[in-house]
């Protein structure tokens, strides 16, 4: 048997809820990896990774740009991880949620690493779907469940099955392949829902809570209401739709008898499918993206983590200590004022008990940091919770 080359790649997920969804296995790897690459959406998780890493760390979202195709960014994310693997380092890549669900760079990097003879594996993480099963309280094995990305659903003209659970991801970025999210094509998804389920069927709009200050979104709408402007503006890049069964499929008595099952059986079978890749790893588009890496200059307009050590430590404690979180929620202003080492802006943001202000005080532009500029209380209070997070992956197109 041929020996594996020095260097390895492990891909892990940070889950959805800040810090608390990171598994003990992933934490152990964070502490041992030679180099960590991460793409996470909240600053508390970013701080936690940096604090616990022994080696270098790099934020993969640096490769995003509003004037750049996301696929190009994904190729570059994969390639920078692979370069360190090829250099003999033990590399850990961390992605928001489950690292294999709606994440293109992770699959690409693992496939190429294995093909080149390196050890490469993926560890599971908590996805938005896992979070949804817990928060909305339905079992996908009852009646069956179909999960699809909104744009993929439309471009392949797939029908939604009214007899099963349907989960539709990325409803806030229909038809978008850049980092500009206007959702101008959302009406096309509504048309499909109207056609397959009717105007009166109810769906649930879901966003799992991320920061300790976040509140899980579980709003119910009739399909006819999805065209209303005041409803449409509630959907963001982190939004997922749950469409419950309209009419469950009837039980087939002959099948029940042939299988020797009780007459009261109600559950259907699950189908399992594998993943196939039919595209070359390094075609013309991929080679252009790789070539651009050597001249890539990170944008100075990308906010970076900038928070006091006290704030970083407190956000970890709020994520991992339920009793402390309850104490904070009971009186956030009084709680914040008793914490030593926090800046005035951090105390103010904590007192608002909302995720948006936390993002504002924990991430700043490099130019603002260099000049000593701090966000005003007005800017902190104005922070929009709905747009505080940017979902950073989409299914391969």
Curated annotation (Swiss-Prot):
Residues modified as N-methylvaline: 395
Active site: 70, 74, 96
Enzyme Commission number(s): 2.1.1.-
Annotated positions of the N-methyltyrosine modification: 393
Pathway(s) served: Secondary metabolite biosynthesis
UniProt-listed InterPro entries: 4pyrrol_Mease (IPR000878), 4pyrrol_Methylase_sf (IPR035996), 4pyrrole_Mease_sub1 (IPR014777)
Subunit structure: Homodimer.
Protein name: Methyltransferase/ribosomally synthesized type I borosin cyclic peptide precursor mroMa1
Organism: Mycena rosella (Pink bonnet)
């Amino acid at each position: 048997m041929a020996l594996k080359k020095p260097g390895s790649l492990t891909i892990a997920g940070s889950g959805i809820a800040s810090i608390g969804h990171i598994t003990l296995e992933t934490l152990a790897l964070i502490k041992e990896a030679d180099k960590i690459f991460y793409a996470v959406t909240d600053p508390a998780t970013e701080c936690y990774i940096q604090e616990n890493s022994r080696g270098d760390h790099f934020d993969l979202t640096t490769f995003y740009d509003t004037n750049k195709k996301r696929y190009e960014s994904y190729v570059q994310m994969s390639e920078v991880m692979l370069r360190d693997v090829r250099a003999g380092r033990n590399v850990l890549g961390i992605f928001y949620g489950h690292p294999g669900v709606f994440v293109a760079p992770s699959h690409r990097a693992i496939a190429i690493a294995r093909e080149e003879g390196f050890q490469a594996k993926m560890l599971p993480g908590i996805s938005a779907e896992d979070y949804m099963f817990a928060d909305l309280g339905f079992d996908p094995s009852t009646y069956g469940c179909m999960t699809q990305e909104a744009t993929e659903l439309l471009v392949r003209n797939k029908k939604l099955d009214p007899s099963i659970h349907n989960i539709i991801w990325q409803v806030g970025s229909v038809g978008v392949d850049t980092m500009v999210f206007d959702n101008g094509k959302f009406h096309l998804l509504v048309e499909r829902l109207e056609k397959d389920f009717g105007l009166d069927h109810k769906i649930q709009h879901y966003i799992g809570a991320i920061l300790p200050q976040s509140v899980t979104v579980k709003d119910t709408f009739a399909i006819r209401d999805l065209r209303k402007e005041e409803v449409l503006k509630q959907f963001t890049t982190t939004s997922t739709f749950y469409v419950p069964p309209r009419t469950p499929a009837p039980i087939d008595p002959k099948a029940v008898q042939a299988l020797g099952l009780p007459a009261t059986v109600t559950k259907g079978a699950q189908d399992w499918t594998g993943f196939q890749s039919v595209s070359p790893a390094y075609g013309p588009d991929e080679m252009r993206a790789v070539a651009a890496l050597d001249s890539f200059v990170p944008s100075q307009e990308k906010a970076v983590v900038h928070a006091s050590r006290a704030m970083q430590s407190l956000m970890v404690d709020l994520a991992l200590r339920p009793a402390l979180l309850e104490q904070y929620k009971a009186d956030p202003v009084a709680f914040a004022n008793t914490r030593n080492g926090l800046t005035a802006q951090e105390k103010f943001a904590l007192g608002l008990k909302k995720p948006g202000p936390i993002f504002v005080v924990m991430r700043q532009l490099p130019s603002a940091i260099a000049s000593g500029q701090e966000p005003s209380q007005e800017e902190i209070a104005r922070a929009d919770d709905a747009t505080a997070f940017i979902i950073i992956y989409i299914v391969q197109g």
